[in-house]
Amino acid sequence: MNISSMLSSDNNVSLKESMTTATDQQQQQQAESVDHASINGNGQTSVSAVNNVQENHLSEFHSSNQQHSSIPPVGTTVEHATTTTTTATNHQPVNSSPLKHSVDENSNPTTISSLKKDTNSIIASILPESYQFDNSYTPTIDQKYKSVFESNINVINQLDQYQQMGHHLKLMKFDEVKLNNYLINTGQFASNYIDRVVAEDISSRNNKISETNKNKELIAIDYSKPLHHNSTRGKEFKWGSTRKIHKVEHKSRRRKPAATTSTTDDSNKAVAAAANGTKDHSATAGTTASANGSDTPDRRHQRQSSKPSTPILIKPKTEPGKGSPEIQPRRSSRPKVKRKAFEDELETADKQSSTQQVKKSQESTGRDHKRVKIENKQEEQQQHQQQQQADEEDEAEAEAEAEQKPKSGALSEAAAAGMTAKEFKAFMRQYDNTYIAIWKDLSRKDGPKGSRSMQQATQGRLINLRKTALLAAREAKRWQLKNTKNQKDLTTKARRAMREMFNFWKRNERLERDLKKKHEKELLDKAKKEEEEREAKRQSRKLNFLITQTELYSHFIGKKIKTDELEGTNADDNLKSNTKEHLDKYADVDGSATHDINAVDFDNDDEEALRRMAAQNAQNALIEVQNKAKQFDNSEESFKNPDTNGEEMNFQNPTLLGDITIPQPNMLKCTLKEYQLKGLNWLANLYEQGINGILADEMGLGKTVQSISVLAYLAETYNMWGPFLVVTPASTLHNWQQEITKFVPEFKVLPYWGNAKDRKILRKFWDRKSLRYDKDSPFHVLVTSYQLIVADIAYFQKMKWQYMILDEAQAIKSSSSSRWKSLLNLTCRNRLLLTGTPIQNSMQELWALLHFIMPSIFDSHDEFSDWFAKDIESHAQSNTSLDEQQLRRLHMILKPFMLRRIKKNVQSELGDKVEIDVYCDLTTRQKKLYQQLRSQISMSDTDLLELESNSTSSDSSLANLVMQFRKVCNHPDLFERADVNSPFSFGKFAETGSFLRETNELDVNYSTENIVQYDLPRLIYDELLTPNYNKSIRDSIYSKFSIYNPENMNATGWLQGINVSPNELKHYSQMDILSRAIEMQNKPTETEKLERINYLYEGDYIPKNKKLLITDHSTSTNSSFISNSLVFSDLVSIKEKVGEDMYLNKLEPAVTPIASAPPITVNCSSMNFTNKMNNTLFDSNIRSSLIPLSLSTELKLMKDQIPLEQYPKSNMLPMPIFDYSNIRMPSMDRFIAESGKLAKLDELLIDLKRGGHRILIYFQMTRMMQIFEEYLAYKSYKYIRLDGSTTIESRREMVQAWQTNPEIFIFMLSTRAGGLGLNLTSADTVIFYDSDWNPTIDSQAMDRAHRIGQTKQVKVFRLVTRNTIEQKILERAKEKEEIQKLVVGNM
C-alpha cells in the first residue's frame, strides 16, 4: 500500500480540516492570480493564462505532496512567500504578500479590512510598548522592509511545518514497517497450512481421475503460480518434501453483466471495468465492451478451455456421403469452483479500485475527504451486488441447458452420426451389449482388484489424514510456541533493553564521575605538588639553618678546646681552611637574642639573615651550657686550691683559664704517651667549658688510662675527689678496678656489684649530703655495670655526680632502650663516652650518642637523618654518589665533641694486623641439611637477611631460621649428635647389694650368663669316652690307639726337623689347644737363648744347673753377628712394631653385630664336669700366660736367677684387629671430617702449633664451644674457656693465667662476653670460627690481642663457608663498616 494512500485515507479530522483550509486558500490564490495575470487591456480574461495558472498550481501541489508526503497541520497556511506573476502586456513582476494579498480596486472591502487588521496587529507587536498605535491612522512603513519581514515570517512558519511533517512521516514509516512484518509472518503461516491441505486433496483426488482427464488436468496446471491458485488436481505431494507445490488456476465462468447494472457515474464505470478484467484506467473513457455484454479475452479463453473434447465413438461402416451426427460435449461431474475465482477477481478489483481512488483523490483535491470514503463504500456494495447477479445468471443458464437436452437428444445424436434412427438404435443396442459385456468382464475381473485398490487408497488416505492431522497439530503447536516465544522474547528484549539502558547511563554517570574525580585529583595533585615544592624548599632552608647553627656551635667550642691541634696528623686538611673563612665572621654576634625555630620566616628571609640568626642561637646555646655548669658548681661553696697560695681560682668560668697546657698529673703512676697527653688536655678543656664529649680512639690506644688521668687531674688541680661514676660492661669491671688502683693508688674505688644484699651494704658508704668529695671521703670512684645501674637507678638518681664515664658506650646505641633513658636522667656535671666504634650498624647509633652528650643541639633524629643519614647509608649500601660537602659539614659538627685517633698514626711501634678470610666448603652431610632448610622457605638468603635485620624482637621466627642456617655451616652435630652403637646383649648380668661391702678389687669374672641353659645328664658325661677328668679307661685306650705314642711310631726322623722329641709330641697331643699354643709360643732355640743370656747379663749370669759342672761354662765365640741380628731385631723395628700394634689393628668395623650373647650355660651334676670347667676357666697357667707379667714377679725371678726359658709365659694375648668389645664409640676422625670448618681449622691448628703461636678462638654459640672442647681433648691441646656463664672472679684468674702461662695453646672465648675490655696481648693469632652481625664486635674482639703491649704481628683468620648465608652476612658487615669509615674514619 502506498504511503500517500495511507495518508489520504487515515489522517485525522484535524488534518482534513487543514487540507480544506489549504485548498480554499489555494483556490483563492488561483483566483487572485487569474485576476492579476489574465486580465488584458480590454478587461477580458485569457483562457490560456487561466489554464497555465491552474497547471502551475496543480504541479506545485503535487510536488509538495511528493516531497513531504504529509498534509500540513491545523492552524498553518500554505502560502507562497513571494509570488511573481506577469501580465500579458508588460510582463512586470508583481510581489504578492501572504499577509496582505495584492488586490485590485474592485476587491471585497471586508477582505481588505481584515488584512489591514492583521497587518496592524503584526506592526503593533513589533513597535515598542510606549508607542500608541491608532487604528484610524495608517503609519507610513517602507513597503520593501514590510515585504522582506513578511517573507521571513512565512519562511519560519514553513520550516516549522516541514519539521512537524517530517516527524509524522517517521512515525508512519515505523508503523508501516511493523505492519508489513506482521503481515509477512502471518501470510507465511497461512501459506504453509494451505499448501499442506491442498497437497492432501491433490493426492486423494488423483485416485478418482481417469487417465485421460488426469493427463489433461496435469497439463493444464500452471506451475508458475502457487499451489493454492491452481485446482485441487495436481502433482502428487510427497510428505516431508520442501519443494513448492502449485495448483491449477480455474477462472470462473460468469455471465456478462447486464447493461442496466452500469451507472452513469465515472467512478462506478471504472470499478465495473476493473471487475470484468479490463485494463483501462481512464475515468473519462467509455466502457463499451463491458456495457454491451461482450466477452473479454480472458473470459473467451476460459470458455474454450472449459469445453470437453469430442469422444471417440465405435460405429458401423456407413456411407461416406452422409454427415456425422452432432456430438454433445460431456459435462464433468465435478462442481465448478466459483467462489475462489470470484474472490480472486474481487481482490484484483479492490486493488485496482484503490489505485484509481488514490489517483482520483490526487486529481480532485478540492473535494471533501469524507465524501471520498462514502463513495468507496458505495462502490464496494455495487461490486458485491454485481457478483451475486453473475452467480444467479450462471445457475439459470445451466438449468436451461439441462432442460433442452432431452428434447432434441436423439435427433441431434443420429443426425450427428450420419445414420437413420433405426441404424442408430441398432448401433446403440450393439453398443449397449458391448458396454454390458465390458462391464461384466470388469465386474468379474477388475472388480476385486478395484475393491482392493479402493481399500488401499482409503487406507492410504486415512494414513495421510492422520499424518496431516499430526503435522497440522505440530504446526499449530509450533506456531503457538513461536508466538509464545515471541511474546517472551519481547519481554526479555524489553528487560534487556532496559537493563542495557540502565547500564549505559550508569556507566555514563560513572565515567562522568570518574572524569570529574580525575580532574579534581589532577588539580589537587598539582596543588599538592606545588605545596610540597614550597615545603621542601622551606624544609631545605630550615635544615640548612639548623646545620649552620650546629656548625657555628661546634666552631665556637672548637676554638676554645682546640680539637684540631690535639688531633695532630689525623686532622682533615680541607676542614682547616674552609672553617675559618666563612665562620669566623660570626664570632662577634650578640648571643643575648634567641630566635625560635618556629618563628623564623624561612620563605622571605635571605640567607645572610638566617646565618646571623643561627649564629646568635649557637652563641646563646654555648652560654646556656656554660651557665648550667656554673650553676652546678655554685650550688655549694667553692673550694680553694691549695696550689694557688691563697689566690682564688674560679674554675667554673672557663674564660679565665685561657689556653693552657696541662702536664701529666703527679698522682698518675704511669707515663702517658704524647697522644695520650693531648687527649688529657682535650678532656680537661671539655670539662672547663662544661661540655660533654666522646673519646673515640681506636681500640688499644689507652682510652681507659686517659679517662683515669683526667680524674687524677681534677683531684690534683682542683681538689675535686668525686664522686665519680664509671659504668662499664660486666666483663671489664675487675679490669677498671685494677687499672684505677694501679695507676692512681690514692683513689678509693667502690666496686658496686654483687647481689642485692651486698649492694645494700655498699650504698651505706654513699655520702649524699656532700656535692664534692675530698680526699678523706668514703670513696672516690664508683665502678658498676650497665645492668646494675638500670636495676638501682632510683638510688643513683639521688646522687649528684661530678663526672660520669661510660665505657664501651655503644651499649647505649639504642635511644629507645631503658638503659639509654635511665642514664640520660642521671644528674652529673659532665659526661664522657668511651667507644672505639661510635657507629656499628647505622647513623641512628651516632645520633643516640650525640643526643646523650648534647640534648639541646641534637634534639631531633628525623632532622639528623635528613641531614646526613640517608645520603651516607644509601652510598654504603648501593654505592650511590655521595655529597662531599655534606660529609665535610658532618665532620665539622662532630670535631668539637669527638676525639678519634687511629693506631697507624699514633703508635708506630705497634705491630701490623693482617686479616685473612679462609673459605670452606660444605660437606655432604652439611649440603643435605642446608638443602632441606632451603626447600622449606621461598625467599633468597639476601631477602632473609633484610627481613631479619629489619625485624623486631617479636619476629623471632626469622632470627631462628637464620640461626639454623648458621648451625649447619658450623657443624651438623649441632642438630643431632652421633650415638654410641652397641649390639643387643642377650644375657644375665651379675648384681651386688652394695659396693661398700666389697673389697677394693671387685672380681666379676664370668659374671654374665646366657639366658639359654640346658641340662647334661651325669651318666652320659661320665660313661661316654669324652676327655674328662682322671679317667683311666680313656688313657689306656688313647695309649693303645694314639699315633703320637712313641711305642706305636716307627719313623721319627721327621721330628728333628721341627725340633720336637717323640715324648714332647706325645705330651703336646694330650694337651688342649690353648695350652698347646701357650707352650709352643716363642719357644727359643739354643743359640737364641745363649746369645740372649750373654747379652743381658754380660757373661755374669750362670744358671744354677751349670754351677755343678767341673769345667767352666763357656759361650760360643762366633755369636757377635747373631747377637746383633737377633737381640736387636725388635729394637730396630720398633717403629714398625708400634705401627702394627697401634694403627693397623685399629680398624673401623664395616658391620656391627645386631646382638651378642655369652656361651650357652651347661648344667651337669657330675663332679668330673665341675672340675673340668674350673680347670678350663680358671687355669692359673693360662691366665698368667695371657696377661702381662707383673713387675714384682719378674724382679723376684731375676733375684732367684731363674733361667729365662723357665720364666712363666706372659702377655701372649695378641692385639685384636677390632676392639675386644662390640660397643662402638663415635669416631673422632669422622667427627672432624663431617664439618668443613672444623676440618680446615684442624689443619690450621697443626701448623700454628708447630710454629709456636698462641691462639684466641671466638665463637658465637656456646654449644659449638662444647663440641670444640671434645676436639681439643681428642687432640690433647691445652686450653681455657671463657663465656657468658663465667663469673667475674674466674675471668680475672683466666686472663692472668693466659698472660703468664705460655703452655696454654688455645683460649676459647665467646665473642659477646670476651670481646670487650680484656687485655690478651700474649696471643698473636685470632681465629673467628663464625662472624658476628656487627662488624665492630669482631673488631673489638681482635683488638684484645692487637693493642698496646703487642710486639708481634697479629694474624686474624676468619672462617667463612662459601655460597651460604655466612657469605651474605660478611658482605652486609662490610657495608656497615663502610659507613663507619665514611663518618669517623677520616676525622
Swiss-Prot record:
Compositionally biased spans, kind Basic and acidic residues: 360-382
Main location group: nucleus
Motif extent (DEAQ box): 807-810
Enzyme Commission identifier(s): 3.6.4.-
Enzyme class: hydrolase
Domain DBINO: 438-563
Basic residues compositional bias, start-end: 241-257
Keyword Repeat in record: no
Residue intervals of the Helicase ATP-binding domain: 684-856
Keywords: Activator, ATP-binding, Coiled coil, DNA damage, DNA repair, DNA-binding, Hydrolase, Nucleotide-binding, Nucleus, Transcription, Transcription regulation
UniProt GO cellular component terms: chromosome, centromeric region; chromosome, telomeric region; Ino80 complex
A Gene Ontology BP annotation from the UniProt entry: CENP-A containing chromatin assembly
CDD domains to which the protein is assigned, alphabetical: SF2_C_SNF (cd18793)
Pfam family of the protein (one): Helicase_C
Compositional bias ranges of the Polar residues kind: 1-24, 90-113
Catalytic activity: ATP + H2O = ADP + phosphate + H(+)
Coiled-coil stretches: 480-551
Composition-biased stretches (Low complexity): 283-295
SMART domains, per the entry: DEXDc, HELICc
Transmembrane intervals: none
Compositionally biased spans, kind Acidic residues: 390-401
Homology family: Belongs to the SNF2/RAD54 helicase family.
Assembly description: Component of the INO80 chromatin-remodeling complex.
Function: ATPase component of the INO80 complex which remodels chromatin by shifting nucleosomes and is involved in DNA repair.
Name the UniProt record assigns to this protein: Chromatin-remodeling ATPase INO80
Gene from which this protein is expressed: INO80
